[in-house]
UniProtKB/Swiss-Prot annotation:
The gene is AOC3. Disulfide bonds join 198-199, 404-430, 734-741. GO terms for molecular function: copper ion binding; primary methylamine oxidase activity; quinone binding. This is Amine oxidase [copper-containing] 3. Belongs to the copper/topaquinone oxidase family. It comes from Bos taurus (Bovine). The keyword DNA damage does not apply. Residues 28-763 are extracellular.
Length: 763
């Protein structure tokens, strides 16, 4: 090879190397250090859009910041200068406790939605504490019309049949702070010796915290609360660290200086006062169990002890989202509904339609209850009615990628509770579409003819989460492509615990040293205002029976033949099914219309619940949660029976403001506008695996609303997600099978927003 040829080959090699380097640089980005930008999928993270239909009012939208501000200004002007900011109010003050949406009457709402009548006036409901009046009381005021209020109307007597006693009011944060100040500054120093010995106590040291219980006493008029004391474990659940001290605080007096400790419980024994406990300790008559303060580490921390691993699977929308959120209205190709959050009652949806037809006017959470047992006073007494604390008030921001899918749509909530100005809870709701990884229906045939047909189960989910003290509740409403609605909740968070002593194992399991996980039940109550084919509905119960039958072709033999039993229920008493008792396996609300096959168009209510036994009716507090007697009850819908519970029931359960059992008075339910009231719950006996906290697995209950002859066939037969092919067809062809197109479509990467968390409220 001559020199010229060598130089030519060398030049070609250099050019080739240069070209390859250019290709590599282009592939890594212009600066050679970063990869080229990927092709992002359209609409990676859908956002909430403003309401753009001026012809229709958003009847069910929660109040905006502007509306809340307008109501507060109006009330401040009308009620005078004696109003105190609820965040600073003492029991003897007047203050505005809460402001939220006053729901419109159903008739007026439907007239607007269906017949384009003018919308009903938009109004707010305010709860006002009048502690400074000669006869302290709680008053409910309706304020309107919004956004520029000009009137307020006292509806207390109209709604409750009389004035609301002051002792029924929920406890303000200021009241809790004053109780803590009393306990830590005035009372605990009287037992400094025994508390230092057991619990490393130092006055002002801050190593102990209190936890409330409820109800607050033993009879109407009481306001005496047992408070348990726990180690203050920063960054972890202090609920698992009881020190064995519980105090009964009487805080009924309007002057906090007059509050007293009525009784003391310490590690298995009762004392009249902390001073008596200290005296007995100094005399050597108290056997003290030393409770170690193990700090922030250990199995009770939610911080993982291992480094992050590979990223979990991620669902995204390769061709963009298939639903939208405008204001408080969610719309998909199949479903539409409006959503909101009651400050006390929790999540709710309205005007629920499938393929344009209304199925329900309202589906809403009403109340959640946890009933505890134990051998300490706080544990044995506790019946938490979470509507008093507030399932909206204590809603939490949803953490992207944990509480909801990373690419869900997140929606804020504005509220005015115990403050003079509205606040915003960021990411209070999420809405997302989810591939459940399960066929909605399918069939593979190898007999007679060969084919496959099916449709993937893709659901639309509306979610919020409430944290009530130690427990977190995940509230879901799930919309299926066959017209079914699933309503459920999951419990997670920390268990409540008590000091372990004596016969403690009768009331749960030991979960750590000196700690009992206390047995309890969870129950939630829902209002389901179904409008099946209109407002006039009937209730049908169907089940099965085996009937002795002579064999027609062999009369000397007999078989037990299975057949359907059907009964129309005529009265509210007939349609009230006690918890734990017999109930029909098929119960549905039906219209006077029939489907193609002559059957009444109906929607079935199917419960999925493992509720514990209800509170015995001879219990003095049972009437406050009398809805817990029933797994399901159907009543006539009445504007005077808007809710099965009340924010005031917790602090006076002996004379409840709302007693659900009164709703069931044997009125006819044939051809009426009906409401189904559904209870779902479960028994929880805490165990070692509840440490550090309870998992959602196996701790979810609820109910389904399922079409029952409502359609002529399964409506998902026309789903665009359906797949069908026969043996002679090429299942790998796009023209035959849309799933076969996925590998051929241009690849895209999800456009992920930055991680977000709505933050924390500082109390």
């Amino acid at each position: 090879m001559n020199q010229k040829t060598t130089l030519v080959l060398l030049a070609l090699a250099v050019i080739t190397i240069f070209a390859l380097v250019c290709v590599l640089i282009a592939g890594r980005g212009g600066d050679g250090g970063e990869a080229s930008q990927p092709h992002y999928c359209p609409s990676g993270t859908p956002s909430v859009q403003p309401w753009t239909h001026p012809g229709q009012n958003q009847l069910f939208a929660d109040l905006s910041r502007e509306e809340l501000t307008a109501v507060m200004s109006f009330l401040t002007q009308k009620l005078g200068p004696d109003l105190v900011d609820a965040a600073q109010a003492r029991p003897s003050d007047n203050c505005i406790f809460s402001v939220e949406l006053q729901l419109p009457p159903k008739a007026a709402a439907l007239a607007h939605l269906d017949r384009r009548s003018p919308p009903p006036a938009r109004e707010a409901l305010a709860i006002v504490f009048f502690g400074g009046q000669p006869q302290p009381n709680v008053t409910e005021l309706v304020v309107g019309p919004l956004p520029q209020p000009s009137y307020m109307r006292d509806v207390t007597v109209e709604r409750h049949g009389g004035p609301l006693p002051y002792y029924r009011r929920p406890v303000l944060l200021r009241e809790y702070l004053d109780i803590d100040q009393m306990i830590f500054n005035r009372e605990l120093p009287q037992a400094a010796g025994v508390l230092h010995h057991c619990c490393s106590y130092k006055q002002g040291g801050g190593n102990l915290v209190t936890m409330t219980t409820a109800p607050r006493g033993l009879q109407s008029g009481d306001r005496a609360t047992w408070f348990g004391l726990y180690y203050n474990i920063s960054g972890a659940g202090y609920y698992l660290h009881p020190v064995g001290l519980e105090l009964l605080v009487d805080h009924k007096a309007l002057d906090p200086a007059q509050w007293t400790i009525q009784k003391v419980f310490f590690q298995g024994r009762y004392y009249e006062s902390l001073a008596q406990l200290e005296e007995q300790f100094e005399a050597g008559r108290v056997n003290v169990v030393v409770i170690p303060n193990n700090g922030t580490g250990g199995s009770w921390s939610l911080k993982s002890q291992v480094p992050p691993g590979p990223t979990p699977p991620l669902q995204f929308h390769p061709q963009g989202t298939r639903f939208s959120v405008q204001g408080s209205r969610v719309t998909s190709s199949l479903w539409t509904f409006s959503f909101g959050l009651g400050a006390f009652s929790g999540p709710r949806i309205f005007d629920i339609r499938f393929q344009g037809e209304r199925l329900a006017y309202e589906i809403s959470l009403q109340e959640a209850v946890a009933i505890y047992g134990g051998n300490t006073p706080a544990a044995m007494l506790t019946r938490y009615m979470d509507g008093c604390f507030g399932m909206g008030k204590f809603a939490t921001p949803l953490t992207r990628g944990v509480d909801c899918p990373y690419l869900a749509t997140y929606v804020d909530w504005h509220f005015l509770l115990e403050s003079q100005a509205p606040r915003t809870l960021h990411d209070a709701f999420c809405v997302f579409e989810q591939n459940k990884g399960l066929p909605l229906r399918r069939h593979h045939s190898d007999f007679i003819s060969q084919y496959f047909g099916g449709v993937v189960e893709t659901v639309l989910v509306f979610r919020s989460v409430s944290t009530l003290l130690n427990y977190d509740y995940v509230w879901d409403m799930v919309f299926h492509p066959n017209g079914a609605i699933e309503v459920k909740f999951h419990a997670t968070g920390y268990i409540s615990s008590a000091f372990f002593f004596g016969t403690a194992q009768k009331y749960g399991n030991q979960v750590r040293e000196n700690t009992l996980g206390t047995v309890h039940t969870h129950s939630a109550h829902y209002k389901v205002d179904l409008d099946v084919g209109g407002l006039e509905n009937w209730v049908w119960a169907e089940d099965m029976a085996f009937v002795p039958t002579t064999v027609p072709w062999s009369p000397e033999h007999q078989i037990q033949r299975l057949q359907v039993t059907r009964k129309q229920l005529e009265t509210e008493e007939q349609a009230a099914f006690p918890l734990g008792g017999a109930s029909p396996r098929y119960l549905y609300l039906a219209s006077k219309q029939s489907n193609k096959w002559g059957h009444p168009r109906g929607y079935r209510i199917q419960t999925v619940s493992f509720a514990g036994r209800p509170l015995p009716q001879n219990s003095s507090t049972e009437r406050a949660i009398s809805w817990g007697r029933y797994q399901l009850a159907v009543t006539q819908r009445k504007e005077t029976e808007p809710s099965s519970s009340s924010v005031f029931n917790q602090n006076d359960p002996w004379t409840p403001t709302v007693d659900f059992a009164d709703f069931i008075n044997n009125e006819t339910i044939a051809g009426k506008d009906l409401v189904a009231w559904v209870t779902a719950g479960f028994l929880h006996i805490p165990h070692a695996e509840d440490i550090p906290n309870t998992v959602t697995v196996g701790n979810g209950v609820g109910f389904f609303l399922r079409p029952y002859n409502f359609f002529d066939e399964d409506p998902s037969i026309n789903s665009a997600d359906s797949i069908y092919f026969q043996k002679h067809q090429d299942a790998g062809s796009c023209e035959v099978n849309s799933l076969a197109c996925l590998p051929k479509d241009p690849a895209c990467a999800p456009d992920l927003p930055a991680f977000s968390h709505g933050g924390f409220f500082t109390n």
